[in-house]
Swiss-Prot record:
Family (UniProt): Belongs to the membrane fusion protein (MFP) (TC 8.A.1) family.
Gene giving rise to this polypeptide: aaeA
Main location: membrane
PANTHER family in UniProt: P-HYDROXYBENZOIC ACID EFFLUX PUMP SUBUNIT AAEA, P-HYDROXYBENZOIC ACID EFFLUX PUMP SUBUNIT AAEA-RELATED
Biological process per Gene Ontology, one example term: carboxylic acid transport
Induction (record text): Positively coregulated with aaeB and aaeX by AaeR.
Subcellular location: Cell inner membrane
Lipid bilayer topology: Single-pass membrane protein
Protein purpose: Forms an efflux pump with AaeB.
Organism: Escherichia coli (strain K12)
SUPFAM superfamilies: HlyD-like secretion proteins (SSF111369)
Name of the protein this chain belongs to: p-hydroxybenzoic acid efflux pump subunit AaeA
Length: 310
């Protein structure tokens, strides 16, 4: 009798353990397959393409590639003597027209005071018209001077914000044209993550939900918050022909590939360019609250690691 009870107890314990293991594995599998996550995520940042507003020879480069710079710091300088001479010429024109305008103003005033008793109306009108023409030329010269001053100021290229200089491709002695990108500036404290979630997982993604970000090749888990979900993506299977008619690509009805939708995630703490913009990461959206790692089972931890490595 005791032997029978012992065998029954062992069998019952084995069955219970198998059931518990199955439940744990099933929960881990659900966690792995159904909760919102993706390995297709990238660190991003606000990038400013810096281009000069004037053309000329580069006379001085004050920074080096990948340097952290402050807002207003000089990056490089373009040929200033040429623009200084242009400003001096414009200032001379302004001075000339100021003197000429004063003379014509006095002449017109004198003729207006004398009136038609001393001269004809035509002569009076002519003096007034000459004055207006000179005043117009003076205003034009002043505008040219202001533009020359602005051009001279813009020969000094400064950093528009704190950030890292990257892809610096200007050197002393080179000629640079107006509007050509000289350097990119990655803004400091502007890093975020773009996670490309499958449309089937968007039900569990909402602005304000918490997220975990694991950079590729790192065991460190960063925390963040879902900032926004893209309002639309391009329909790659539909185009228009030259007559404006819709062209729909053929596909297999039983094979439907889920579209990926960009989800922007705001990082809790900026990482000071430890993971540069463009590097990849794994993102898991944990819901309204952070995941309690102390409550994770062994199988769930395994599932979490599987997400990171494939």
């Amino acid at each position: 009798m005791k032997t029978l009870i012992r065998k029954f107890s062992r069998t019952a314990i084995t069955v219970v353990l198998v059931i518990l293991a199955f439940i744990a594995i099933f929960n881990a599998w659900v966690y792995y397959t159904e909760s919102p996550w993706t390995r297709d995520a990238r660190f991003s940042a606000d990038v400013v393409a810096i281009a000069p507003d004037v053309s000329g020879l580069i006379t001085q480069v004050n920074v080096h590639d990948n340097q952290l710079v402050k807002k207003g710091q000089i990056l490089f300088t373009i040929d200033q003597p040429r623009y200084q001479k242009a400003l001096e010429e414009a200032q001379a024109d302004v001075a000339y027209y100021q003197v000429l305008a004063q003379e014509k103003r006095q002449e017109a005033g004198r003729r207006n005071r004398l009136g038609v008793q001393a001269m004809s109306r035509e002569e009076i009108d002519q003096a007034n018209n000459v004055l207006q023409t000179v005043l117009h030329q003076l205003a034009k010269a002043q505008a040219t001077r202001d533009l020359a001053k602005l051009d001279l100021e813009r020969t000094v290229i400064r950093a528009p914000a704190d950030g890292w200089v990257t892809n610096l491709n200007v050197y002393t002695g080179e000629f640079i044209t107006r509007g050509s990108t000289a350097v990119a500036l990655v803004k400091q404290n502007s890093f975020y993550v773009l996670a490309y979630m499958e449309e089937t997982k968007l039900e569990g993604v909402r602005p304000g939900y918490r997220a975990e970000i694991t950079p590729l090749g790192s065991n460190k888990v960063l925390k963040g918050t879902v900032d926004s979900v893209a309002a639309g993506v391009t329909n790659a299977s539909s185009t228009r022909d030259d007559k404006g008619m819709a062209t729909i690509d053929s596909n297999l009805e039983w094979v439907r590939l889920a579209q990926r939708v960009p989800v922007r995630i705001r990082l809790d703490n900026q990482q000071e360019n430890i993971w540069p913009a463009g590097t990849t990461a794994t993102v898991v959206v944990t819901g309204k609250q952070d995941r309690d790692e102390s409550q994770d089972s062994f199988f769930r931890k395994m599932a979490h690691r599987l997400r990171e490595f494939g």
